[in-house]
Amino acid sequence: GYSLDSIKDLLEKASDKDTLIIPILNVYGTGPRIQRLVPGVTVLDGCIYIVGFVSGRGEITQMGKIFRLVYGAHRSTIVSRETLEAVQRDLQESGIKAEISDDINRDTFVKWSFISAMAVTGAYYDVPMGEVQKPGKVRDTFIGLSQESAALGRKLDIEFKEDIVEYNLKVIDQ
């Protein structure tokens, strides 16, 4: 996992009471964890959708046109709608599709669910994402892991907009 504690000093040094932090790590619950590290700073939560690959040493290449940031205030953070919309405008002016979430806890869990199922399936079978699109044991594993995430989400009282397994399959089949 990520060592969030290691960034505390940097965040304290680089921010003040007017700073707004939007973590976009593929980790569920990042915003609240960072908020506890730097209580004097406003920390939201977020997730990013982008497709890319390591194309060289210290280099990442974006593939396709998917580049979307979903963000919002987690339960213990109060941020004005005006501030959230100002961030959205800045991101959109930079060419990033930005969405303000009405339930960032749900939306970051959904992203985590997809990434987790894909990463474990890919690592276990040593296959790229395209193999999950084909019927068989690789896809069945991805479905099983997505079902486990759905069960965990229900235990966490997360209300999904749609069935998380169907959603994950829709994403993988695009």
Summary of predicted features, one role per range:
Residues 13-14, 37-42, 57-162:
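Internal alpha-helical scaffold of NAD(P)-dependent oxidoreductase catalytic cores
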